[in-house]
């Protein structure tokens, strides 16, 4: 006897926790990292699923915005500059990742208002002539 009960012949392939939750990121790996990281003595079964879904959502959001930035610059490959532009131009992501430095990200283009050339109106020429 194999000890599998009545359905000894019908072996079903195991389904991963990522597939059960409908996620792409690995739930098992996140669970292992939570256990090995000494964050708590015990880790519940729902915590890694929730954390994995949050990580997957944030990654998808950042990559979508970075892809839009790459397309705006007529590029087909996302580089750190596109990630920087995507994060800094989004209010919520900028608040979340405000203290993060992205290597090779550059800075946002910003010219102070006082340094811009003044717009000359029609009455300016008469006032400057003496």
Swiss-Prot record:
Top-level taxon of the source organism: Eukaryota
Residue(s) carrying N5-methylglutamine: 104
DNA repair recorded as keyword: yes
Marked site: Not ubiquitinated: 118
Modified positions (Phosphoserine) in chain numbering: 127
UniProt PTM: Phosphorylated to form H2AS128ph (gamma-H2A) in response to DNA double-strand breaks (DSBs) generated by exogenous genotoxic agents and by stalled replication forks. Phosphorylation is dependent on the DNA damage checkpoint kinases MEC1/ATR and TEL1/ATM, spreads on either side of a detected DSB site and may mark the surrounding chromatin for recruitment of proteins required for DNA damage signaling and repair. Gamma-H2A is removed from the DNA prior to the strand invasion-primer extension step of the repair process and subsequently dephosphorylated. Acetylated by ESA1 to form H2AK4ac and H2AK7ac.
Positions of crosslink type Glycyl lysine isopeptide (Lys-Gly) (interchain with G-Cter in SUMO): 125
Major localisation: nucleus
[ST]-Q motif (motif): residue ranges: 127-128
Residues with the N6-acetyllysine modification: 4, 6
Cellular component terms per the entry's GO annotation: nucleosome; nucleus
Subcellular location: Nucleus; Chromosome
UniProt record, GO biological process: DNA repair
PROSITE patterns hit by this protein: HISTONE_H2A
Entry-linked SMART domains: H2A (SM00414)
Pfam families attached to this UniProt entry: Histone, Histone_H2A_C
Keywords for the protein's UniProt record, in alphabetical order: Acetylation, Chromosome, DNA damage, DNA repair, DNA-binding, Isopeptide bond, Methylation, Nucleosome core, Nucleus, Phosphoprotein, Ubl conjugation
GO MF term set: DNA binding; protein heterodimerization activity; structural constituent of chromatin
Additional remark text: In contrast to vertebrates and insects, its C-terminus is not monoubiquitinated.
Recorded domain comment: The [ST]-Q motif constitutes a recognition sequence for kinases from the PI3/PI4-kinase family.
Role noted for this protein: Core component of nucleosome which plays a central role in DNA double strand break (DSB) repair. Nucleosomes wrap and compact DNA into chromatin, limiting DNA accessibility to the cellular machineries which require DNA as a template. Histones thereby play a central role in transcription regulation, DNA repair, DNA replication and chromosomal stability. DNA accessibility is regulated via a complex set of post-translational modifications of histones, also called histone code, and nucleosome remodeling.
PANTHER family with a match to the protein in the record: HISTONE H2A
Family to which this protein belongs: Belongs to the histone H2A family.
Subunit structure: The nucleosome is a histone octamer containing two molecules each of H2A, H2B, H3 and H4 assembled in one H3-H4 heterotetramer and two H2A-H2B heterodimers. The octamer wraps approximately 147 bp of DNA.
Protein name: Histone H2A.2
Upper taxonomic lineage: Eukaryota, Fungi, Dikarya, Ascomycota, Saccharomycotina
């Amino acid at each position: 006897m194999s000890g599998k009960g009545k359905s000894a012949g019908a072996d079903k392939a195991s389904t991963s926790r990522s597939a059960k939750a409908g996620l792409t990121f690995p739930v098992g790996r996140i669970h292992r990292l939570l256990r090995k990281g000494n964050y708590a003595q015990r880790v519940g079964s729902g915590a890694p699923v929730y954390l994995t879904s949050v990580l997957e959502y944030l990654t998808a959001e950042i990559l979508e915005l970075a892809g839009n930035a790459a397309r705006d610059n007529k590029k087909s490959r996302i580089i750190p500059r596109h990630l920087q532009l995507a994060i800094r131009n989004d209010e919520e992501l900028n608040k979340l990742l405000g203290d993060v430095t992205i290597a090779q990200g550059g800075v946002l283009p910003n010219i102070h208002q006082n340094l811009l050339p003044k717009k000359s109106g029609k009455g300016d020429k008469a006032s400057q002539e003496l």
